[in-house]
Amino acid sequence: MVLDGFAAYFDAYLENIVREGKSEHTVAAYRRDLEELFALLAQMPSEDAGGVPQDLSRRDFTAALRRLSQRGLDGRTLARKLSAWRQYCAWLVKRGLMRADPTADIKPPKQPERVPKALPQEWLNRMLDLPVDGGDPLAVRDHALFELMYGSGLRVSEIHGLNADDVYLDEAWVHVTGKGRKQRQVPLTGKSVEALKNYLPLRQTASDGKALFTGRNGTRLSQRQIQKRLESWAAQYGDGRHVSPHMMRHSYAGHLLQASRDIRAVQELLGHSSLSTTQIYTKLDFDHIARLYDEAHPRAKRQDE
């Protein structure tokens, strides 16, 4: 049975990526994707899946992908799962437990390019400039959280992981631990500094006292709690539009890129390893870019001007 061979090193692999510093979220995702693969391979006829890692072929993995596709999974999800499988196979090959990686030449399903949704700048300014009840610690906390979310473009996981000593208000920057434990420094807006100065004296602290954003009991806000606070705020004061932490980050990236035209700087601020990841934000507002072109390019001006 393939699980006796291919899956025999599963626990050792997970222990290895934990040692490499992968986040709990990433490790859990790899675990789910690989356990799903093992289950799919176990369901295949014996002639389709071998008993030891060397017996596995490209056909086994394409068959597993095909079954997942038949369940209605989209291309992006299938590509992510294939990536997890490929990394496990590469780890086995590196340790001499497989002769070759059978996933190496499998192309991930083609994914339609998705342009991120950005919130209107005027709407965000209006929402963030709403009066804050200084006597309500949670309202003061949420205002600081939302200012930081839009003002510095942090991922919800990064905000969740912030400690109070990661924030340097006098210098107006924040120390962020991003994907893959990568460290970066991100500037704080004047509005964020002001909101954090109002919040920090009211902050509830648990025994260790490290977390920047905490609940009533002083414990660190979870990613889900942060998301729900944002949704509640938008529902209460907004116009009914859906708002998520991811949209706040997209808005930061798009608005900053429109103003600066410096894609490399935006890449650094967002913590993107690849410039191609940042380039999708160049498609956020083609009308805005077209207007800049009309105003700036000498050949774009009308003859009667």
Curated annotation (Swiss-Prot):
InterPro entries hit by this protein: CB, DNA_brk_join_enz, Integrase-like_cat_sf, Integrase_catalytic, Integrase_recombinase_N, Integrase_SAM-like_N, Recomb_XerC, Tyrosine_recombinase_XerC/XerD
Top-level taxonomic group: Bacteria
Keywords: Cell cycle, Cell division, Chromosome partition, Cytoplasm, DNA integration, DNA recombination, DNA-binding
Pfam families: Phage_int_SAM_1, Phage_integrase
Every Tyr recombinase domain range: 114-294
Function: Site-specific tyrosine recombinase, which acts by catalyzing the cutting and rejoining of the recombining DNA molecules. The XerC-XerD complex is essential to convert dimers of the bacterial chromosome into monomers to permit their segregation at cell division. It also contributes to the segregational stability of plasmids.
Protein family membership: Belongs to the 'phage' integrase family. XerC subfamily.
Subunit structure: Forms a cyclic heterotetrameric complex composed of two molecules of XerC and two molecules of XerD.
Name this polypeptide is given: Tyrosine recombinase XerC
